[in-house]
Amino acid sequence: MSKKRLYEIAKELGKESKEVVARAKELGLDVKSHSSSVEEAVAAKIAASFKPAAAPKVEAKPAAPKVSAEKKAEKSEPAKPAVAKEEAKPAEPVAPKTEKVAVKPQSRNFKAEREARAKEQAERRKQNKGNNRDQQQNGNRQKNDGRNGGKQGQSNRDNRRFNDQAKKQQGQQKRRNERRQQEDKRSNQAAPRIDFKARAAALKAEQNAEYARSSEERFKQYQAAKEALAQANKRKEPEEIFEEAAKLAEQAQQVQAVVEVVPEKKEPAVDTRRKKQARPDKNRDDYDHEEDGPRKQQKNRSSQNQVRNQKNSNWNNNKKNKKGNNKNNRNQTPKPVTERKFHELPTEFEYTDGMTVAEIAKRIKREPAEIVKKLFMMGVMATQNQSLDGETIELLMVDYGIEAKQKVEVDNADIERFFVEDGYLNEDELVERPPVVTIMGHVDHGKTTLLDTLRNSRVATGEAGGITQHIGAYQIVENGKKITFLDTPGHAAFTSMRARGASVTDITILVVAADDGVMPQTIEAINHSKAANVPIIVAINKIDKPGANPERVIGELAEHGVMSTAWGGDSEFVEISAKFNQNIEELLETVLLVAEIQELKADPTVRAIGTVIEARLDKGKGAVATLLVQQGTLNVQDPIVVGNTFGRVRAMTNDLGRRVKVAGPSTPVSITGLNEAPMAGDHFAVYEDEKSARAAGEERAKRALMKQRQATQRVSLENLFDTLKAGELKSVNVIIKADVQGSVEALSASLQKIDVEGVKVTIVHSAVGAINESDVTLAEASNAFIVGFNVRPTPQARQQAEADDVEIRLHSIIYKVIEEMEEAMKGMLDSEFEEKVIGEAVIRETFKVSKVGTIGGFMVINGKVARDSKVRVIRDGVVIYDGELASLKHYKDDVKEVTNGREGGLMIDGYNDIKMDDVIEAYVMEEIKR
């Protein structure tokens, strides 16, 4: 027998698959979904079960809504369970009890009320117990019924579910019908649609008709006004016409008589003509009060700007001014012709090279065409935008009778002009200034100890290795007079710093140790002082030592041109002991005496100028510069240009670290507020305002950059081979960080002077301040190591250096840096080796072994033959082969060497053509120290 699926049965019956599946389950069939298949007999049984259930569909008639929902429920549920009836019973006694509670007695008896409430609650509990008992009994009965007739209970539930679905479908159908009826009513009541195209066409036709009507009316009005005006002119008598002509002639004569005085404006004659009416259908603009005349019809009525432009254009004005249209201008007075003003020529003309003709014309108040004409007569072809040289401008001014002077342009960025200009200082304001004294001498001759004694402090004990690392500027008072001291380093690396100190000083104190005598840096200090034309006071120090010999020192100095006044020279000699404060007062008196002879003067009223003694980069303050004021007075908040930098003086401290607001001539101060750290030895100057200072500083920085670029060497035929050779050199990349700018300069110069053949030093970067992360990053990128002089790396930089394997060398003594750098440079050189013969042997017998090679039996005749040595095979005085030993044996034992007079066997690596009487020469390569 064939089978059918449930969805096929549903399709035949016109039912949903869900209903068919539910009916099959009601009939007790084991089906799961609409895809389940059943026998044809079962399918016929399912189809037959739907035939009596077709009656509920009739309820969708119009009479159905009249039946109430309660009756429908009664019909659809013919047999309600007994539990429902018993549930309705407890509701009957509730109503009378609520009525009793609602009626309140006049005097409340709370006790009676509590008793009544207690009785009510007891009755409710009894009723609930009875109901619960009945429900349990009914539930037990239902369970028994379910056990006895499970199929019947299942069919009742399915019937109820089916009835609910039928009711739901009827409600949905009813709502759909009502919705359709409402839509039909709305469609019947809606107004007819408007035909917008027809409406727009009708409106446009009405507008065109109205416009045509108004245009005709305006044209008729214009014609009527024109005819009325013509008739009025005809009516005038000839006498009136002659009177008007006479008035016009008088007015013309008055206008010609007036040349400089402008005539008063007369009111124009009243126009008796009928005024033209404006268009009634167009609003007039507020700013346009002219009247419209007759116009042709325009297609584009909405373009009001087009009409306005036509009315205000030159074309309309020209049209009005044509012949025959001048009737309106008859009574208007002509404007007087203004004469051109005459400008007198200047007596002097200050010019610069490259001025154009237009600029000259503007300055002398003449037309450029006039000047071009004069130049043409002089034989110079020029236009108004062409530049002229100074000679042509002078010839042109001679032609005009003007005295020409060339303008001298002042370079605002030139600071050095303040030091050489004669008119910068006021001779009447000059006052005596303190002397600037520089202490010079060789290393460890006692310069800083002397200065320490003068200042009563212990600066010298803090100096590393007994070397002063940078210039210090201090000021002391002796007998009520100030003396400024500059301390210079004595090491050879600080030559530039000593030269800088000599350039700003007035007196040089040359410190020479009585036990050491004249040293190389002593001679250098003498040369610097002589070059600067500075008087020298010789302080022979350490006279307290047993080996002191001042006379020898005086003789050695005389050999170098420093003669004592006792010997007929001009240098003062003072024997002192800086350590024990011996003869210090005599030295200071000598300084004041020499300063008095020099008559040192300064003008404190001008803007301050001076020199940078030292500069550094402070972590908290930024750029800090030590300045020596040479002329003028430096104040806080002064705009200043220092070298190639600029700024404003924010704070100023003296040599004791105290803040000051004013610094006079010969006063050393430290300032902050610069945008960068300047170079030591740069000049500084105070400007009028910050704007000019900024412009000068930026211009100086720009010039310095251009100069640096121009100084870059270019490859030429002369240095081409040197450049190629330099490419073969090895370089040591170094980053230098120091505490002050002078130390940076000294280190850079010293490292670049180190002469190691084949290796050169490359300064990748040098700056003032602590070693930071950017320095470590640069060192890693350029394969360099960092040299820190009197500075320390930050914690972050130290961690980064350890992570990136960057070497940081910290030093406080400059000659140790130089020695360490020399060793590093020598270590970078390729090792050089020299050949050394260690022994000779003669082959006495040869043995050929298969799969091994030729073994040579030998005897050492000189020196020794080592296993790790190289050998040469010499036959008849000619080297046949040069190689290494493969094995070396003494009898059957492997040995490291065979000494003189002994026998052994050897095999040469890669060579088997050994013959008797061959000489084996053993040698090694030894490294040569450089």
UniProtKB/Swiss-Prot annotation:
Transmembrane segments: none annotated. Keywords: Cytoplasm, GTP-binding, Initiation factor, Nucleotide-binding, Protein biosynthesis. InterPro entries: EF-G-like_DII, IF2_II, IF2_N, P-loop_NTPase, Small_GTP-bd, T_Tr_GTP-bd_dom, TF_IF2_bacterial-like, TIF_IF2. Residues 577-579 are annotated as: G5. Residues 487-490 are annotated as: G3. Signal peptide: none annotated. It is found in: Cytoplasm. Residues 68-90, 110-125, 157-167, 262-295, 337-346 have a biased composition (Basic and acidic residues). Its main location: cytoplasm. Residues 541-544 are annotated as: G4. Residues 50-67, 129-141, 309-318 have a biased composition (Low complexity). GTP binds at residues 441-448, 487-491, 541-544. GO terms for molecular function: GTP binding; GTPase activity; translation initiation factor activity. One of the essential components for the initiation of protein synthesis. Protects formylmethionyl-tRNA from spontaneous hydrolysis and promotes its binding to the 30S ribosomal subunits. Also involved in the hydrolysis of GTP during the formation of the 70S ribosomal complex. This is Translation initiation factor IF-2.
